[in-house]
Every structure is written in C-alpha cells, then in structure tokens.
Design a protein with these regions (language model features):
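Short, conserved charged micro-motifs
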Residues: 13-25, 86-90, 130-135, 179-180
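C-terminal edge-of-domain segments
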Residues: 159-181
Length: 181
C-alpha cells in the first residue's frame, strides 16, 4: 500500500464557529508569508457554493488544505499529494504535523477550535489503498505508531467508517481515555 496519498480531518469543536468567507483572506495571507513548513503555497479556491463540499481550499504543491464541510461536519482537512523518502510511520507523522500546524494557525487567525480527540484519516487513492480489510490491516500499525508519536503516547481506537468498497478507506480515530481509579 502506498501511504503518501493520505489525509487527516480535524473536526471543528464548534461547527457554528466556521464561517467560510473568513478563511479566504487568511489563506491568502498564508500564501504571501509562505508560513506552512515544507509546503509551497500556491492558490485559494472558493467552493463554498457546494453543499457539504470542500469549502475553501488552499492549494500547495505537496498537499491541499481545506476548510471542509463534508458530511455536515466542518473541519480542517489536509491531503498529502506527493510522496516522501520517509518510512510509512514518518510519512504519517509528517502528515499529522502539517495538519496540526495549520490547525494551530487557524485557531490563532480564525478563532476556530478543533477536536483532537476524534478525527478521521482518509486514503485518497482507491487504486493503491482500496477500502478493504487488507488495506485497513496494513495501515493500522504505522497509523497507531504515528499517532502515539504525534500525540505524546496517547492511544487511539481505530475503526473503518464504511465497509463499502466504492468509498475511500476512511479510518475513525478516537482517543482512548484511560480510567484511573
């Protein structure tokens, strides 16, 4: 399985705080400053007219950032488009770090907060990462390891959101809260 075409979506903690028009000037400012590490920021596209669509898209050479409205759950989504020379765990870690950097900037610039206890990981390549048990089994070990690295040892429960092979492989990541007595 090729892991470079993966994405992560952090859901907005308060969906009503997401006003799509506010993100256009923010993303243009990011392009002017080129402030996302390891990304050549290129353009902004407004898809706010599309119901439950990609919202506002920030295009970079290496991946796309979007204020996504999919499934009626607003959030920040980052899709990596280009491969790296990194191991699968390191590559996934880099994807999370890129999305986390963008989320921190948005929390500062747009005053929107993101839920880091529940999010999804999407394989954006049906050919090389089909939505089946084998691909999910191959993705789980590096994904779990990357999550532990990025979220400082936290455990996450990973489940497929759909068994429909026509859908992209989407993994729900839910932070496991330890019960201390």
């Amino acid at each position: 399985m090729q892991v470079h075409r993966l994405g992560v979506k952090f859901f907005a903690a308060d969906p009503s705080s997401v006003r799509l028009d506010a993100f256009i000037p923010i993303f243009h400012g990011w392009i002017q400053k080129q402030n996302l590490t390891g990304h050549l920021l290129i353009d902004v596209h407004d898809y706010s007219h599309t119901h439950q669509g990609p919202g506002i898209l920030l295009v970079a050479h290496e991946g796309n950032f979007s204020i996504d409205m999919g499934d009626g759950r607003p959030g920040l989504i980052y899709y990596r488009k280009t491969p790296t020379a990194l191991s699968p765990i390191e590559h996934l870690t880099a994807i999370f770090r890129s999305a986390l950097q963008a989320s921190r900037f948005l929390e500062r610039d747009a005053r929107v907060r993101f839920n880091m206890d529940e999010f999804i990981v999407i394989a954006n390549d049906r050919l090389h990462a089909p939505n089946n048990d084998q691909t999910f089994a191959e993705l789980q070990p590096p994904l779990s390891a990357a999550l532990k690295q990025v979220f400082e040892g936290a455990e996450f429960h990973l489940t497929r959101t759909s068994l429909d092979d026509k859908e992209r492989l989407t993994v729900s990541c839910m932070r496991v809260v330890s019960q201390r007595s």
